[in-house]
Structures are given as structure tokens and as C-alpha cells.
Amino acid sequence: MKEQHKQFLARYGSKEHIDKLVKDKNLDVRYNLAGNPSLHKEHMDELVKDKNLDVRYNLAGNPSLHKEHMDTLVDDEDRNVRKNLARNPNLHKEHMDTLVDDEDKWVRWNLAMNTSLHKEHIDKLANDKDELVLNKIKNHPNYKSP
């Protein structure tokens, strides 16, 4: 099968196609698969362990990501994965609780863009030590200046 066809199936294919593609050697195929909002839990189980950070990065931004996969990705060693998770519109509160204290300012900056943020997280980011994070949270639609 041609690589281009595999990439298309990774995004739009049936479960049977995806079953075959989840362990494909081609990074682009797995990357496209990770962003598929119709991805089944069993496929996410495989992709959350992928050694390639680009695959985990794309999975972290998937709006259909299951809580248990967020549990894993919230502690990912790569900040880019955590940054994309921070932007996920369906991020669970407990993961916001973790990411709001992330040591990396860019993770917190990306969290400040998440329109699903709870008031307590907005308030905490409004007192962040980093100027970039402060400026970003002040542009949040639910931010109320003191």
C-alpha cells in the first residue's frame, strides 16, 4: 500500500484499517493516526507508548483522548507533549491542576490559552512568576482583572 494511502486511512479509515496501521513503521502514518478523533481506546493504548515524541505530541492534542492517556502524558518527559496536552479542550481538571504548576513556562503559557480553564487555574496563572504567562492569561476570555 502506498504511504500516502496509509496516511489517509490513518485519519479516516475504519477500525480494521487502523488495527493494521497502529504499529506501522512510518512515522507520518502513526502521527496522522494519533490525531484521529475517532481513534479507539485500544489504539491510544499503543500510541501513548510510542517512542517518537511527535506521535505522542499529536495524541496529546486529540480532543477524544481518554483520561488514562492524559494521566500518562501529563508527566511526559518532553515539554512539547505537555504543551499540546495543556491546549487540549477536553483536558480534565486534575491534569490542569498538574500543568498549572509545570516547571516549564511554555507549558503554563499553553495552558493559559485553554478556553476550558477553571477559575482557580486562571487565578493561579494570573499570579505566575513569568511575564509571558501573565500576558497570555490576561487575554483569556474568562479572565477578570482584579
What are these regions (language model features)?
Residues 1-146:
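Alpha-helical scaffold segments
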